[in-house]
Curated annotation (Swiss-Prot):
GO terms for cellular component: cytoplasm. It comes from Aquifex aeolicus (strain VF5). SUPFAM superfamilies: AraD/HMP-PK domain-like (SSF53639). Gene3D superfamilies: Class II aldolase/adducin N-terminal domain (3.40.225.10). This is Methylthioribulose-1-phosphate dehydratase.
Amino acid sequence: MNVELFKKFSEKVEEIIEAGRILHSRGWVPATSGNISAKVSEEYIAITASGKHKGKLTPEDILLIDYEGRPVGGGKPSAETLLHTTVYKLFPEVNAVVHTHSPNATVISIVEKKDFVELEDYELLKAFPDIHTHEVKIKIPIFPNEQNIPLLAKEVENYFKTSEDKYGFLIRGHGLYTWGRSMEEALIHTEALEFIFECELKLLSFHS
């Protein structure tokens, strides 16, 4: 690893560690669930290693991988690494991807029987950079909880290649994926969707 790459990787490691603490403090990555990544260059990505507690990450828990998910210098990356690399390939402007296992995202992915959650008329949708009014309707797709990650990654790729809604996705009974042009933006998008999912679940309870 050359000096410039090492410096950039080290910066992303610190971003991921801080993001892990934030996500854990909100209860969105219990136990060793979830994963976090950040783009280092057009060739490499920094990502959490498999089975690490996101609230207690150390620099040794963050791996450098290529865009095919292969680690550079050893270590076992997250089992869902290909979902991260798929997002980076789909959206070149993305510089961070966050995957959470929160109660709200998990529950809404189960109770919603369609293959998407439709969100509209929420002021907080303006947390996304291309949305400037609450008078909008977006879809967050729900994919089956497929253990064959290459197959799931292909399903995600096929969906977003033709969809105008590019804000995140759910895996049924599993959790949420969001992303952003920076780690800060990815965390903002996560928080916005978490709030809206909580509102949706409360509305469902009122209507039941």
